[in-house]
Amino acid sequence: TSQMGVDADWHVGITAETPAYTSFVLAGPEGVNIRSRVPLLGAHMAANAGLAIVMLIEAGFDAERIQAAIANGIDAYLPGRTERVTGETGPDVYVDFGHSPDAFLNTLAAVRKVTEGRVFMVFGADGDRDASKRPEMARIAAEGSDVLVITDHHPRFEDPASIRKTLFDAAVAARPNLEIYEVSPPEAAIRKAVALAQPGDAILWAGPGHQDYRDIRG
């Protein structure tokens, strides 16, 4: 197994977390000890990299050769996966494709660790998908951020206003005094967060990731 649990055969330990990368050490049987970093934010991303390395070793690749190949970091570009799109000035901005409660939890925790100021979250929920997870997503978003901006994603054939209301009501129930805004067009929602944020703050645009389209009634 590869995890961070005490009884695992392989362990991923985080050695550094910055807005630009996460450094880790992978320790395993027979003294295997591999150090590297991923150009992604979050311990969960380092754990994914560790699992990939374990799979290579279990497939017969030499651990020392793997270490030599990735000693200076793993070169990867994954659009929309805690992707940092920060400009030269202003707040840190991250785009993440995750659209589940677990994804929200991990990504918000990662952003919080590297943010000195407030954490803004701009998010919505897809239409014609599992509606039962929407209240939980909104609860996690509310508990993990300082300012929420609820917007539309891909409403498909659902009423986007109804989706937003479900998210808004669940967020208010979780944290009644939280600063929450409802802005339907995603472009306007992002602009709202940028206008409110200050240097030292961070904005997480969660859900559609790198997608540059919207699915509205097909």
Features from the language model and the residues they span:
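Short beta-strand elements of ligand-binding domains
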Residues: 1-5
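ATP-dependent carboxylate-amine ligase
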Residues: 8, 20, 28-31, 35, ...
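A short, compositionally biased
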Residues: 17-23
